[in-house]
A protein has these predicted regions:
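Aromatic-anchored transmembrane helix interface
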Residues: 68-81, 92-117, 129-135, 139
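Membrane-interfacial helix-loop-helix modules of multi-pass inner-membrane proteins that assemble, modify
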Residues: 85-93, 125, 139-180, 312
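Hydrophobic transmembrane alpha-helices and their immediate junctions
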Residues: 333-379, 405-406, 410
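Long extracytoplasmic/lumenal interhelical loops at the membrane interface
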Residues: 266, 270-331, 352-358
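Transmembrane alpha-helices of multi-pass inner-membrane enzymes
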Residues: 370-415
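A membrane-periplasm/extracellular boundary helix in multi-pass inner-membrane enzymes
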Residues: 220, 237-275, 288-293
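Transmembrane signal-anchor hairpin modules in multi-pass inner-membrane enzymes, especially those
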Residues: 1-85, 122-125, 195-201, 352, ...
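Alpha-helical transmembrane segments of multi-pass inner-membrane proteins
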Residues: 128-153, 172-221, 226-239
């Protein structure tokens, strides 16, 4: 195992960069400066990646270094280059506009950077502490803006970056959109902390996170998210807690596959009959019509400085509102397959890492467990909400894969 040590001053710089990347990636800065904090988060993620790549070059095996340096460069670079090229060729758009419009994918470099740094001396416990501190800061940040922002004025603002922060319906009124992924992971992890608290401070912190997350949910009341979380909590002890339980899942898989059309039809009807369902139905039809002739690479990545999807398709058309169909619209069948592969890869790595940590330490890692449960919940809602294709999901996915892979290296037999 590599045993390089980080100087104290460099360690604190790394942890600070990690906080910025996570806070911005989970969209904590979207409430001010038109989310310009995201650019700082991207720069922080790239800095961590370059530093990890530099240290790994001297301390890691060549095969491992290539996998965690060249692999992410080819994957992220390929997504950005291909999607920008496709859009610019089909609609005479500016390549650079589309390329930089996809810059949120650069947040994916955070995970490889953290993995490489942990493999070359950064204590993984420091990473966990920064993640929990960031989750807590995101919750406090959200509540501050919820209590101080004029939500009605923001909702009717002519500035799209401001109006997009608030949603409204007659039942729940005006609601400020939260950093949902981080809050749900915090809620799940805090639950595990309460049940296996390893000290008074951990117990108090877990209760504080639970209280904040519960209060935020009482504001936003995202029922579909809560339903999938509860379903994931039910599935975990039945199918995912032990390797032997997975055999039961394999036995039941034919029945589950047979029930998919019924479940999908019910979910689709609920999706379309909800508020705005008529617009979603037209958006679905427009996407399917487009994919008939552009099924391989899709439409590519649009930008705010040229023709957008609303100019090309319809004013009401937003791919992010129509689930996996929207992903296929943007990136084609190739992008859709790549998305499903990455989703499965992250989920499987988290499952293995959770078993590994529990077998090695005798208890659960609350963060790994929470990430596994959230990915399981995302799987149930995958068709309608492919969240890993956007900033919050990219940040969560890359962090989850890095932590899971690092845990698996800890449990691997020494060569």
């Amino acid at each position: 195992q590599p045993s390089g040590r980080l100087a104290l001053n460099l360690r604190w710089i790394i942890l600070g960069l990690m906080f910025l990347a996570l806070f911005a990636g989970f969209q904590g800065g979207r409430y001010y400066l038109a989310n310009r904090l995201q650019e700082l988060g991207i720069a922080s993620a790239l800095t961590l990646f370059m530093l990890g790549a530099w240290r790994g070059l001297f301390l890691l095996p060549v095969v491992e270094w290539r996998r965690w340096v060249m692999g992410p460069v080819l994957l992220v670079g390929g997504i950005m280059l291909v999607s920008a090229t496709v859009f610019s060729l089909q609609y005479d758009g500016r390549f650079l506009y589309s390329f930089f419009s996809a810059r949120e994918f650069l947040l994916a470099f955070l995970g490889p950077g953290l993995y490489l740094l942990c493999r070359t001396g950064l204590p993984v416990d420091d990473v966990r502490k920064v993640v929990w501190f960031t989750v807590f800061a995101l919750m406090v940040n959200y509540l501050w803006f919820f209590m101080t922002m004029d939500l009605s004025a923001a909702f009717f603002s002519s500035d799209h970056t401001v109006s997009n922060l608030v949603t409204y319906d007659q039942w729940r009124g005006f609601r400020l959109k939260p950093p949902l992924f981080a809050i749900m992971v915090g809620l799940l992890g805090a639950l595990m902390m309460v049940f296996q608290a390893r000290g008074f401070r951990h117990f108090v912190f877990a209760l504080a996170v639970l209280a904040l997350a519960g209060y935020i949910w009482s504001i936003v009341q995202f029922r579909a998210t809560l339903a999938t979380i509860l379903l994931a909590l039910l599935v975990y002890p039945i199918f995912l807690r032990q390797i032997s339980r997975l055999k039961m899942l394999l036995v039941l898989s034919p029945l589950m596959i047979m029930s998919l059309p019924v479940a999908a039809d019910h979910a689709l009807q609920t999706f379309l009959l909800a508020e705005g369902g008529g617009i979603r139905a037209r958006a679905f039809m427009a996407a399917f019509d487009y994919l008939e002739s552009h099924w391989l690479f899709g439409a590519g990545e649009d930008s705010a400085y040229g023709d957008s999807y609303q100019d090309i398709v319809a004013p009401y058309f937003y791919p992010s509102d129509i689930g996996l169909v929207g992903t296929a619209f943007k990136y084609g069948i190739i992008g859709l397959i790549l998305y499903l592969w990455m989703h499965g890869k992250i989920g499987f790595a988290l499952w293995r890492a959770n078993l590994s940590f529990r077998d090695r330490m005798g208890f659960h890692d609350p963060l790994l467990w929470a990430l596994l449960l959230f990915m399981t919940a995302q799987t149930f809602n995958l068709v309608l909400n492919p969240g890993l294709a956007y900033a919050q999901g990219i940040t969560l996915g890359t962090l989850a894969l890095a932590l899971a892979r690092f845990e698996l290296t800890q449990s691997a037999p020494a060569k």
